[in-house]
Amino acid sequence: MMKLRVLTLGILIILLITACSAPTPTTPAAAPTAAPAPNAQPTLQQVTLAMSYIPNIQFAPYYVAAAKGYYAAEGIEVVFDYNFENDVLQRAATWPTSGVAFATTSGTSVLLARQQGLPVKTVMTLYQRFPIAFFAKSNVPLASVNDLRGQTIGIPGRFGESFYALLAALYAGGMSEADVTVQEIGFTQTAAVMEDKVPVAIGYAMNEPVQLRGQGVEVNVLLAADVFNLAANGIAVSEALIAQNPELVRKFVRASLRGLADTLANPDEAFDLSLQFIPEAQLGDLSLQRQVLQESLPFWQNELTAQYGLGYTDGQLWTRTEEFMRAAGLLSAPVDVQQAFTNEFVPGGSY
């Protein structure tokens, strides 16, 4: 009887051990797998965009392209480098030594640079209309170029886009500097007009007039582009970059134009995205800056961009610009305009 109990107890223990060690039929064991590999991030090619001004809402299309990942989608990471216009062209011209692949600059500056032997070329135009304006208080007539005759006109100095706009207006109106009084006032145009130090001043159409209106001053504005349009701002690169890495140029332009299209379609979103690239100390009045962006939009598109696509460069405009610059003495010799720009990288342009 005792042996039977011991035997029975032993069998129960064996059954219990077997049951505990058996796999649960409702939860099959998974096959062993390797540890998941971390998501591999693509390596982005870093390129520098030399910008001819301080961080500013006028660069919104490039900021939007960066913020929305359009550059990254093309495999590039853009570094924004701020400096002066002459310097950015010099640096772009000496790529790859300078490390600057792209530069924001005007068509007038490209023509001047090429006369000096710098092998630079515009590959994308942002401003289809020259963004300079003559402005005055509302009691000063400013309906046409003829209203400039006999006026005192305040300009920052005899250099840069404002000076070129003045010379172009006089050229278009059949006048010379003898027909006006030019007063160099530095970059104080807004205050100079508000305080009646000069009746007329020249500045950026989306800047000084907007500031005056924001302070309750009614202004008359004469757009330089309505008098004599000039080749304006876009992206310039060296001929060496085009020859050695045209695909990089194509990628940068394509991403930038996506940013431009989004900015035009949704300027409020573009403004908000741009704020992360502009130091707070340089922002100033946000409502004013928002208006600056809004005023910029019409300058970035026209009937040619509707036909050929955003970023298109108008060859006829460049030809007229070169002819004016020679007549005004800004260029001492002819410049081959067809070598100064290309539309090959602009979708819709000539390939």
Curated annotation (Swiss-Prot):
Keywords: Cell membrane, Lipoprotein, Membrane, Palmitate, Signal
Membrane topology: Lipid-anchor
Origin species: Chloroflexus aurantiacus (strain ATCC 29366 / DSM 635 / J-10-fl)
Subunit structure: The complex is likely composed of an ATP-binding protein, a transmembrane protein (RibX) and a solute-binding protein (RibY).
InterPro entries (UniProt xref): NMT1/THI5, SsuA/THI5
Localization of this protein: Cell membrane
Entry similarity comment: Belongs to the NMT1 family.
Residues linked to a lipid group, S-diacylglycerol cysteine type: C20
GO biological process, one term: thiamine biosynthetic process
Record bears the keyword Lipoprotein: yes
Protein task: Part of an ABC transporter complex that transports riboflavin into the cell. Binds riboflavin.
Protein name: Riboflavin-binding protein RibY
Induction (record text): Expression is probably regulated by riboflavin, via an FMN riboswitch.
